[in-house]
């Protein structure tokens, strides 16, 4: 829509009035005085909160963004990153042409990047993929995707890899951030994603943050918590962390614990609830079962690592056995005050204060967590154990009572998880190991039986290892910066990308660390340069239209995936016995079979909105986004993952699934709120066959690496307010760059004094794997206790993941970036 100055000023006033924290909208006066702009809705490009923004376009360029007053999530507010969204697409080094490593006029692994046409790029790329498939088979090709893919980009990638190339070697960077949340949900409830929603914030009495600095990482949700805390004096905020950060400013109770001991604290609270008679017996008896999870499961390291060799259940980390409530009670009884205080460093009075909040039946509790739980060698367990507390007390799936896993990326839920871009998954919580699930996917996709492989492919960490080992030879990376993001860069990621046996393609908008490590770089369109859809942390699916053109030469990731599929005849990638089951596919391309299958191409160009561009639909001659979405949605409709019809999302500010008969669901599993819960049951955890949630008995186990005399400090990595992930977008926004130009090493002043270093002094942060140079910060926003340092990872000039350990949770296969041993050396 086009707003007059008067209308825009009125809208701006409404947005300002909506602020609970006095946020000022940058540039409002200048914009109000300018000529009229064309404004449209879109979800924010950054975190998983899913804020709605109004995007102002003038002369074919995004010139302004501000909070959308009609968006339920943020109610007119945006954080500082959201306010500068208009600048993320206009960095001076934007990629606009494919770049191929060449020497003497042809591709060479040790060549220099040179511009090539899209046809040349795809010719070379297709040659490597075809040769690899012919010589080594589907397990030698792979793809690393993203929780920043749009829904249809992720879905197109799933089809290309798992159906077209018949390879499950597809994984998203959400493996680094949300995999433990997924396995936690699946083990406890049999279905992924939260049962509650953001509306719980306005109904809760207590907020408990477990390893989550919401003040900086989810600031808009933090403003809602702040509003609840300040407007309702009885509300309490508890923050647990391994170091002090900005969320401590609002906290009524703060707990700093020894890394990894959150597991022991969770069991202490469960023990407290049982000992003090606060178990909701009726709820537990009717709606839960108990299991003992396998322990001593290893740390996801290479098989020759001693910690893997000695792990008793490394081969079955997800295993469990049924137990009784009494056996569970006995199991957690060992987690008494003396034992847990010794492990965690937290005094009993603080443990009891926290435990009482969970135990009190009159107190509604929201538990929030993100990377502190998920990036954890026992992250799945941590997720299971916080659910234990809510299930024991019945504080779940009702307004204000919600265990809530926060999401780091804008569509880690909507794309990575729901679409099934993980190496073991298919859409709508289906998995490749289940023959019925494979059969259903093959039916929907019109594929011959046996097309989809039955074994999970290489996950994110394993992909780097297989690249290094020469077992993954044709590899495509889209919408992520994994050479900066992966742990143990020098040991695994970089040697893998530069292995002469590997041909690596990176699609990106800027020359990131990962792009520079590739053999072929493809320039991508981003955000509102294409039509898109994201799914946020509260199950809210949101659409946007293409609002501006991408730079000449750049193409969307969807276009790249689908156009590339035209290069492959079915007989070049499928075995003869498989093709014999569908002889009518002979001579057809993967494009014909996957994307012109009578379903994806059934919506004509005339169904696109004539007020907006749609480059992909124009390129392929049909409304490809709608076709992909509707085919994908057929997986979940009628199975508890119902999505609304495509056109509904362009009209709404997002809808929370399951959407049944046009109505979204705010609280799942609860009678009267969730249409899938049968009348008279109260609660029904229908992801599990028996309709019951699982309470797990799980122990404390130590991390794989702890400080010692040689490496006396814990290292934790993470983010800061001003930058997002690897900083490839935010560091190109001048205002955000100036606000926090470079990473620093936050450390305790007494540690700095003992070492003879002062604030601003250059030091090495060194582990057994590598080191970086950075500067000491003793007065900043983050205040580690003695013996721990914190270094953000946004700075490409300080690759802190040279230092980190590539240990993972053996169930979720997610990396632990929050704890390894380092030493600090004065330069």
Swiss-Prot record:
Sequence ranges assigned to domain 4Fe-4S Mo/W bis-MGD-type in this UniProt record? 37-93
The record ties this protein, via Pfam families, to: Molybdop_Fe4S4, Molybdopterin, Molydop_binding
What cofactors does this protein use? [4Fe-4S] cluster; Mo-bis(molybdopterin guanine dinucleotide)
Q: How is it modified after translation?
A: Predicted to be exported by the Tat system. The position of the signal peptide cleavage has not been experimentally proven.
**What residue stretch is flagged as signal peptide?**
1-32
A biological process (GO) of this protein is: nitrate assimilation
Reaction(s) catalysed by this chain, per the record, are:
2 Fe(II)-[cytochrome] + nitrate + 2 H(+) = 2 Fe(III)-[cytochrome] + nitrite + H2O
Q: Which UniProt keywords apply?
A: 4Fe-4S, Electron transport, Iron, Iron-sulfur, Metal-binding, Molybdenum, Nitrate assimilation, Oxidoreductase, Periplasm, Signal, Transport
Q: Where is Mo-bis(molybdopterin guanine dinucleotide) annotated to bind?
A: 81, 148, 173, 177, 241-245, 260-262, 371, 375, 481, 507-508, 530, 557, 717-726, 801, 818
> Which InterPro entries would you find in this protein's record?
Asp_de-COase-like_dom_sf (IPR009010), CT_Nitrate-R-NapA-like (IPR041957), MoPterin_dinucl-bd_dom (IPR006657), Mopterin_OxRdtase (IPR006656), Mopterin_OxRdtase_4Fe-4S_dom (IPR006963), MopterinOxRdtase_cofactor_BS (IPR027467), Periplasm_NO3_reductase_lsu (IPR010051), Prok_molybdopt-oxidoreductase (IPR050123)
Cofactor binding: number and manner = Binds 1 [4Fe-4S] cluster.
Places the protein is found: Periplasm
Q: Which GO molecular function entries does the Swiss-Prot or TrEMBL record give?
A: 4 iron, 4 sulfur cluster binding; electron transfer activity; iron ion binding; molybdenum ion binding; molybdopterin cofactor binding; nitrate reductase (cytochrome) activity
Residues annotated to bind [4Fe-4S] cluster? 44, 47, 51, 79
So where does substrate get bound?
Answer: 793
EC number(s) in its UniProt entry? Answer: 1.9.6.1
Q: Name one GO cellular component term.
A: periplasmic space
Q: Which SUPFAM superfamilies match?
A: ADC-like, Formate dehydrogenase/DMSO reductase, domains 1-3
For this protein, the record's PANTHER family field holds: PERIPLASMIC NITRATE REDUCTASE, RESPIRATORY NITRATE REDUCTASE
Describe, as the record does, how this protein assembles with itself and its partners: Component of the periplasmic nitrate reductase NapAB complex composed of NapA and NapB.
Q: Which family does it belong to?
A: Belongs to the prokaryotic molybdopterin-containing oxidoreductase family. NasA/NapA/NarB subfamily.
Q: What job does the chain carry out?
A: Catalytic subunit of the periplasmic nitrate reductase complex NapAB. Receives electrons from NapB and catalyzes the reduction of nitrate to nitrite.
Name this protein carries in UniProt? Periplasmic nitrate reductase
Species this protein is from: Paraburkholderia xenovorans (strain LB400)
Q: Which gene encodes it?
A: napA
